[in-house]
Structure formats: C-alpha cells, structure tokens
C-alpha cells in the first residue's frame, strides 16, 4: 500500500512539475523578446534604404531616406572613406566611421565636414532601425538642442547560434557631473555640426595639443567645450532649455559591451583648468577658500560614545584647506549623557580648519527634520553638511571633494557612498524614485565589484541622496524651505532632495567619497512594527502629495529599468513589470481552513507593496488626485514573494490572507504567480523558486473598515499538508472608504 501511495504521489508531483515548467517558460521573458515587443509598439517604420554612389576617388555610401536622394558631387573625396551621408527632412546627416577614433586626431577632417548633423559611433556596432527617426524628431522639435545620445545593447549569437540582443545599457537623462567624471554617452551621439565646429574653433584658439591625445579623448574635450558654451552646466533642467537630450530608446547595437571600451576615457588632465570655467558664476566670496565656512550639523540623543566616535573620526582623518565648525543638536539626552557629551566636546583638541564645536540642547520628541532645521538656523556657515551621529570618516579628502561639487552654482545636494562598517558592502549609493517608493541603490552589494556600467564608481547625478551625509549651500537649503517638519522620521531627506531638483538644481552622489555608516543605532529600523509601518506609509503619502509630478518617475533612472518592486540593483524591467489590467482577484472567507493549517515559519511571507490601487497608479489618494474614477474601479494592489524553505515549491498552491485584527475573520485572496529572477538567484539551495513572486488586485468594497494583518496559506497539491504563516505587514482600511 505504501508503494502505491508513493507511486500516486509521484504522478501528482510530475503533473505539478509539467504545469510549473510551462508557466515558468511563459513568464520568463528574455530581454531580446521584451525589447522587440516594446519597439514594435512604438510604431516606427524602417523606411531607410542605402545606395552606393561614386566619388572622385572611390565608392562611398549614400543613404536615401523616404525616397530622397542627394547626388554625390565628389566634394568630400579626400575623407569619404570615413563617412556615410543621408538626408532626412531636408537635413543632411553624416555618420563618421568608428575607425576614426582609433587614428591620430585630424582637425582638418572635422573642420571640413559639410553637413547639418554628425553621428559619431565611438566604437563598432550598428545604428538601430529606430534611431534616425528619434534623432531627427528631437532636433526638429527643439532648436536649442546641440547633442543627442541614447541607450544601447549588444547583438551576439546565443547558444543556438541565433543573433539576439542582450546586455542593455540604459542610461540616465543629461547628467552634467557624470559627464565630467566619465563618458557615459556610450557608443553613439548626434551633434549639430555648427555647434561642434564652434567648440573646435575655441579649442584651436586655446592651442590644444592634438598630437598628444587619441581621437576619442579629443572629441570628449570638444564635446565638453560645446556643452559648456551652450550653458549645459547651468541651473535648470526644463527639456526645452537643456542643450543635451537623452532619447530613452535603444539607438545603437554594439558588437561587444560598450562600457568596457570607454570606461577609462577621461577629460584630459589639462582640462582641469578648463573645468574651472563652470565655476564662473560663483560669488567672489566663495571663490577664495578663506570665504568658505562649512557647518557640520549632527543630530543626536543619548548616544555619547557613538557621537564622539563620529566627531573624533572627523577631526583625526579630515585634511582640508576649508574651515568648518561642528554643531551637535540634542533633542533630550539624559542628564548623565548630557554632562558626558558637554565634557567631551569641551575637551576636543584643536585641529587645522576646525573653528569650534557647539552643543545645542533642546528637549523635544524625535523629529529629524526639526533638529536639522534648528542646527541650520544656528549655524554660521555658508555651506551646510547634515551628518548622522553614526557616521565614520575614513578618507582624508572627503570634505574637500564634497565641497568641490557643493560650491558649483548648478549643484544642489551632494551625497557620498556609504558602506557598512569595516566592509566593502554598500549601504547607499544614491536614491532612485521607484513606483513602490524611494530606494537606496546598490544596497548590500559588494563594492569590490563594478555594478551596472560603473554606478558605484565616479560621480553621478541622482534624484536624491541620504540625509545621513548630505551637503549643500545655505542658499539651496533655504530656497527649498529646509526639511519638512511634518516628516519627522522618514522621507524628509528624500523630500528635500526632490524639492531641490524641482527648483532646477542637480543633486550629486560622489562614489569617490566613502564613509562607514553604523546604520539605525539610535532608533531601530523602519517598518519593524505595525506602528512604524503605518507611520512610514503616512509619511510616504505626504512625500508624493508634495511631489505628484515625480511619482513613478526619475530622470536619472531609465523607465526601462525595474520600477515596480523594491529594487536596489539596476535590472531591466523585463525581469519584473506590473500590468494593472490583471483581473480582479477572487476573495472568500477561509477562517476555518486557516485554523486547520499548521503555522510554520518555514513558509516565508514577503510583502513588498500593499496599497490603494489609485495610489499605485498616481501616487496619491483619489480625493487628492486629478484623475477621477468610479467606485467600481477602486481597490487595492498587493505584491510580494513567498516560498516554503526546504520543500518543492512547484507543488504548493498559495493564497494571500487578510486577517481582521479585531474580529479574527480571515479572507483568502487568489494570487497571480510572478517570475522572480532576483529571488531565484538568492535561493540557489531551494527547489523550484522561479515563481516565488505574487500579485493581486482586490476590489475595495470587499473589506470592511479595520486593520488587517497579511499572511499566506500554502497547500501542497500532492499531499494533505497545509501551512500558514503571518507577516508583520498590515493594511488599514479607513471608515470613509
């Protein structure tokens, strides 16, 4: 009998595996398939044909666009080996050969180009079929544009010898500080010839030593001058006023990963002096080092050892020509700790540059924003640095490097890369604005490796940086209105950065400035209790009510990157993309079934999103949004992951649970399984965890008012086993909904 039971069970297991494998295959999109589907929806027709035409000396390629043809008269016969020419809507375009960038600089070549637009492939590859349409459209619609760049991927053979697209490099919008740090434009740029030749003439007058550099570096230099001459390093980033445009589409297919070919490309050392031109609008008082005073503002309470360790690391390791002061803002340490702090601060050694340390004691409930605002009000500096008391300085030039950026007239907030103590594990490398909320980028990843085309190297423009280490000019802080005091704990730094961006400034994260962050020593982690989770949700509501235009958007994070889950890496969206057109989930009371299940922590319940469906789409509640919907369209959106440790997850059917905390009534919500490559990669020792993700859309009218706790019911389809476990996440259903 036992053998028969085992045989029947194996038949059931095999059946589950077949169904599971089919679903995995259907949900596991490849980048190649996903991007082609995206581009097909753009409706861009491939209407370009190429023809050969004979010049005076040899054959070269002329491209005909939409039936237009420009006869070659041999005017360019001395350099036509390196050119392709075509016309689009009465504009002449010339594509130069990437071979040019491996040869010595030839200024005469660039000066003699007679064309409206130059397309420069910086390495070998192919211009995409949609590129010319987008480039032409942008130049036509914006007369102020002088340069266009786009995204790129790699075309290569897969294991079946088919040519497929892979390795997408999805770039940010115009990022002036990243451009000064590295040539992130990549494989293809398009420039207006007139602007390029104007910058070329400027460099000629400056007697650039063309023989001392390669053509790529030389063009990098010309592009810098071109962008500078057209105010690309200025406050303000309205699309019609910025001379550089990022087309958020794949415009180039490289033969190998492009980043590896230009990652070491830098502006010439001789150009450091030229970069100083960007500072020309800084007030004279700030041009001299002695005119700068940095106020380091440190909020702290009842952490004398941690606080003093932070301050000692500043004094012992900082080497700077700038003057600075330290202000400690204490919101109510005990008398014993207060005395200890005052004694230690009064005994601090004098160091070069440090102009004193003040202790501001004002008992009040914890409010990070209010404490920082108090410190800023009392500070004497024209630059402000907000620093957590659990930070540790580890490099001498950290302050000077941050000040270098913070003093630029177009720069807003300046942050640093933070690591967990005594490790190379990243805690923070900027903040991106995902649909599920702001996220620390690259958190928990190894800083010893290069991540997503250098995102943990060099200098980057980001929408936000953590307030744990955030520097800015006083005028920037005051223009933004300081920290919002209704955001007492969370999102106050994000809100400030978003406001600074909306005011026209560029926020910066310097990955070449590294500090250790002994995170959350003072108040614990957000979301670890029901009270903290609900407070976090309320503060997130305030954030997006204030910044509705930014909800679900980030100019420095490509929309083809993952936006729909809490993502610290830079993963293309084909790995996880939410479609709200999913059917409404079936829901039923299942209190008895849940009570009969075994509660077991081996059933992992991960919640990532539980929110009003309208908020998911628009960032605010229906009464505060501009889009109006009917009551039938109102509901909730749930998303997360779940798996059973040490079991065959292909055999389990899972049901999301919502338990009314007052009456104990339990609702079961049918789920859609989602492919989660990130979970799979982190659970290499677990079986069949490809479809650990889940999502559901629930009509609002099903739930009565109250607070509901989330859980999961997992039923083994090949045995009688039922498991249940509960999350600490809750959903608050208001009485007025």
Q: Where in this protein do the model-derived segments appear?
A:
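Acidic donor-binding segment of Leloir-type glycosyltransferases
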Residues: 76-111, 315-364
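Basic, ligand-binding patches in group-transfer machinery
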Residues: 51-54, 85, 89, 125, ...
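Short aromatic/hydrophobic "clamp" motif used to bind/position activated sugar donors
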Residues: 117-118, 384
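Cell-envelope/extracellular polymer assembly enzymes that use nucleotide-activated donors
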Residues: 58-63, 293-297, 325, 495
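A short, conserved alpha-helix in the catalytic core of glycosyltransferases
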Residues: 195, 209-242, 247-248, 399-402, ...
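C-terminal, non-catalytic tails of nucleotide-sugar-dependent glycosyltransferases
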Residues: 2-58, 259-294, 422, 436-461, ...
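A recurrent flexible, glycine/aromatic-enriched loop bordering the glycosyltransferase active site
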Residues: 167-193, 369-370, 434-475
């Amino acid at each position: 009998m036992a053998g028969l039971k085992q045989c029947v069970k194996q038949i059931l297991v095999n059946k589950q595996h077949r169904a599971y494998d089919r679903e995995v295959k259907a949900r596991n999109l490849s980048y190649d398939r996903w991007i082609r589907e995206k581009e097909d929806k753009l409706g861009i027709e491939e209407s370009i044909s190429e023809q050969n035409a004979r010049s005076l000396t040899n054959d070269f390629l002329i491209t005909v666009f939409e039936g237009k043809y420009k006869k070659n008269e041999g005017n360019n016969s001395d350099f036509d080996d390196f050119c392709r020419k075509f016309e689009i809507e009465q504009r002449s375009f010339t594509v130069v050969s990437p071979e040019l960038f491996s040869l010595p600089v030839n200024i005469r070549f660039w000066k003699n180009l007679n064309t409206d637009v130059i397309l420069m492939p910086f390495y070998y590859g192919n211009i995409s079929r949609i590129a010319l349409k987008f480039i032409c459209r942008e130049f036509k619609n914006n007369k102020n544009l002088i340069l266009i760049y786009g995204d790129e991927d790699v075309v290569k053979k897969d294991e079946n010898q088919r040519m497929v697209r892979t390795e997408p490099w999805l770039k940010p919008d115009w990022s002036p500080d990243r451009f000064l740090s590295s040539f992130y434009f990549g494989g293809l740029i398009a420039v207006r010839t007139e602007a390029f030749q104007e910058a070329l003439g400027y460099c000629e007058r400056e007697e650039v030593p063309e023989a001392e550099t390669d053509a790529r570096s030389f063009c990098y230099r010309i592009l810098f001058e071109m962008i500078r001459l057209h105010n690309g390093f200025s406050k303000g980033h309205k699309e019609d006023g910025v001379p550089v445009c990022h087309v958020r589409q794949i415009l180039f297919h490289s033969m190998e990963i492009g980043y590896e070919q230009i990652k070491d490309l830098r502006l010439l050392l001789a150009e450091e002096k030229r970069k100083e031109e960007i500072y020309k609008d800084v007030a004279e008082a700030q041009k001299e080092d002695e005119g700068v005073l940095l106020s380091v503002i440190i909020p702290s309470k009842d952490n004398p050892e941690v606080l003093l360790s932070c301050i000692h690391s500043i004094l012992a390791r900082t080497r700077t020509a700038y003057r600075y002061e330290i202000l400690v803002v204490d919101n109510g340490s005990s008398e014993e700790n207060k005395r200890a702090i005052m004694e230690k601060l009064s005994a601090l050694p004098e160091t070069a540059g440090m102009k004193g340390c003040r202790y501001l004691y004002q008992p009040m409930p914890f409010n990070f924003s209010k404490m920082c605002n108090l410190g800023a009000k009392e500070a004497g500096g024209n630059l402000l640095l907000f620093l957590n008391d659990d930070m540790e300085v580890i490099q001498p030039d950290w302050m000077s490097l941050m000040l270098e950026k913070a003093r630029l007239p177009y720069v807003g907030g300046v942050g640093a890369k933070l690591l967990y103590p005594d490790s190379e594990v990243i805690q923070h490398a900027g903040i991106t604005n995902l649909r599920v909320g702001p996220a620390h980028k690259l958190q928990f990843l190894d800083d010893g490796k290069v991540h997503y085309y250098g995102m943990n190297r060099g200098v980057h423009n980001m929408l936000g940086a953590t307030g744990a280490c955030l520097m800015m000019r006083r005028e920037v802080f005051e223009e933004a209105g300081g920290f919002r005091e209704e955001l007492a704990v969370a999102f106050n730094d994000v809100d400030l950065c978003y406001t600074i961006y909306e005011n026209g400034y560029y926020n910066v994260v310097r990955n070449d400035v590294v500090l250790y962050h002994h995170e959350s020593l003072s108040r614990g982690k957000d979301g670890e209790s029901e009270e903290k989770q609900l407070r976090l949700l309320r503060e997130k509501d305030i954030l997006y009510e204030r910044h509705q235009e930014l909800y679900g958007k980030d100019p420095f994070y490509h929309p083809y990157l993952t936006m729909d889950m809490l993502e610290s890496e830079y993963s293309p969206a084909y790995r996880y993309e939410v479609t709200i057109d999913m059917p409404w989930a079936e829901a039923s009371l299942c209190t008895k079934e849940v009570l009969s299940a075994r509660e077991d922590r081996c059933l992992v319940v991960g919640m990532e999103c539980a929110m009003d469906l309208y908020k998911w789409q628009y960032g605010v509640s229906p009464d505060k949004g501009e889009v109006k919907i009917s009551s039938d369209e109102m509901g909730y959106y749930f998303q997360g992951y779940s798996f059973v440790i040490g079991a065959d997850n292909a055999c389990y059917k899972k049901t999301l649970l919502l338990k009314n905390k007052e009456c104990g009534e339990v609702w079961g919500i049918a789920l859609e399984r989602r492919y989660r490559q990130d979970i799979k990669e982190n659970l290499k020792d677990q079986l069949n965890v490809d479809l650990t993700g889940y999502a559901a859309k629930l009509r609002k009218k099903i739930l009565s008012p109250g607070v509901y706790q989330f859980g999961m019911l997992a039923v083994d389809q090949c045995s009688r086993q039922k498991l249940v476990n509960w999350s600490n996440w809750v959903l608050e259903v208001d009485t007025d909904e």
